[in-house]
């Protein structure tokens, strides 16, 4: 069962019922709580653009609990975060892995956070190929370029040398919230708002 909770709010005109995500959106909170796919990306991008149109000066809060997912869908979110004027604060609640971790570290500098029991994981992009040898070679080149680009981005956002990032992302590299802070993925581990 996938029930979405509702909240009831008193207004001048009477009671108003919201699904919880719409209510959080009023407070400029966007949640990624699943694998990142095209549908999730479209929803998150729409929310970011809406919040920018509402107020381009106020920060947006992106809460992340995601195992990652599609790189193209992830880049749609990441590019929109960079495109819009408001700072996007990021917060890992639970797990931010793969592209979830990339979104986490791409928040506004000084505004990237993790809750104390969060876990963060970085690794190289995953992919597969089938078909003729030429098609496999083209796909392999694309994945290797993507790997280089992602490692470069992690290095730039964290301040780590690219050689260390390349080494760490060869396999799944898990970190606690405090380890992610030391690595430069988040700026602080928070226990209170």
Curated annotation (Swiss-Prot):
The keyword Iron-sulfur does not apply. Fourteen ClpP subunits assemble into 2 heptameric rings which stack back to back to give a disk-like structure with a central cavity, resembling the structure of eukaryotic proteasomes. PROSITE patterns: CLP_PROTEASE_HIS. The active site is at 98 (nucleophile), 123. It is an enzyme of class 3 (hydrolase). Its main location: cytoplasm. The keyword Protease applies. One of its GO terms (cellular component) is cytoplasm. Its EC number is 3.4.21.92. One of its GO terms (biological process) is protein quality control for misfolded or incompletely synthesized proteins. The gene is clpP1. It comes from Bacillus anthracis. It is found in: Cytoplasm. Keywords: Cytoplasm, Hydrolase, Protease, Serine protease. It catalyses: Hydrolysis of proteins to small peptides in the presence of ATP and magnesium. alpha-casein is the usual test substrate. In the absence of ATP, only oligopeptides shorter than five residues are hydrolyzed (such as succinyl-Leu-Tyr-|-NHMec, and Leu-Tyr-Leu-|-Tyr-Trp, in which cleavage of the -Tyr-|-Leu- and -Tyr-|-Trp bonds also occurs). GO terms for molecular function: ATP-dependent peptidase activity; ATPase binding; serine-type endopeptidase activity. Belongs to the peptidase S14 family. Transmembrane segments: none annotated. PANTHER family: ATP-DEPENDENT CLP PROTEASE PROTEOLYTIC SUBUNIT (PTHR10381:SF70). This is ATP-dependent Clp protease proteolytic subunit 1. Cleaves peptides in various proteins in a process that requires ATP hydrolysis. Has a chymotrypsin-like activity. Plays a major role in the degradation of misfolded proteins.
């Amino acid at each position: 069962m996938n029930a979405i909770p509702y909240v009831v709010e008193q207004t001048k005109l009477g009671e108003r019922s919201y699904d919880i995500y719409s209510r959080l959106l009023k407070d400029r909170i966007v949640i990624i709580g699943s694998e990142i796919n095209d549908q999730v990306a479209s929803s998150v991008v729409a929310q970011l653009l809406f919040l920018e149109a509402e107020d381009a000066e106020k920060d947006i809060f992106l809460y992340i609990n995601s195992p990652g997912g599609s790189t193209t869908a992830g880049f749609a979110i990441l590019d929109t975060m960079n495109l819009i004027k408001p700072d996007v604060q990021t917060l890992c609640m639970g797990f931010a892995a793969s592209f979830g971790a990339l979104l986490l570290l791409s928040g506004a500098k000084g505004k990237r956070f993790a809750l104390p029991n969060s876990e963060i994981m970085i690794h190289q992009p995953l992919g597969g190929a089938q078909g003729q040898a030429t098609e496999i070679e083209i796909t392999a080149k694309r994945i290797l370029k993507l790997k280089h680009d992602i490692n470069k981005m992690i290095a730039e956002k964290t301040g780590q040398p690219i050689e260390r990032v390349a080494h760490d992302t060869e396999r799944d590299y898990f970190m606690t919230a405090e380890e992610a802070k030391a690595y430069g993925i988040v700026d602080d581990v928070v226990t209170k708002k």
